Amino acid sequence: MNTPADSLIELAKKTGAIKFGEFTLASGAKSNRYFEGKLLTLHPEGACRVGDAICNILEGSGVQAVGGLIIGAIPIATAVAVISQMRGKPLLAFLVRESPKEHGTMKLIEGQLEPGMRVAIVDDVVTRGGSVFKAIEAVENIGCKVVKVVAIVDRHEGGGDKLIADGYDFVPLIHFNADGTVQANKLF
């Protein structure tokens, strides 16, 4: 039986988001697998499936807003916001900049976050967790509570383990395993 998780992997391969070859990652590490998340999340079916999967994961968590570091989180947070609205359980979307704007409002975080809000951080890939931890720090600094961290892909190169060790509820949709296999998370 083909589960929604397995279908997401099939679509990621079909859109070219999952690639095999020789790649240099943002961390500088070399890899024989690469996930080009925007090819999945900017595809109409991919955006719907990712948004739907993350909404399922967030169900019952009390999350009020979802977002993360630009640019990877932009289509993910938008998809989740749209799907949540369609389900009648709207979640706000927000974006964290690499650094505050140098003009206008000079914001680090775009969106309607307020202190005390329960938020989920999303990203396309977690390798060592740098982007996710920047987003976590930014929202926690304004008084928000991170109750869930969701990535489309966990590369299993330390980031996911560090999130869990630091007390965050981390859920990937897809695992890139050390043996080279790609495995769906059956939780959604």
Please tell me what each predicted stretch does:
Residues M1-V122, V126, G130-F188:
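PRPP-associated nucleotide enzymes
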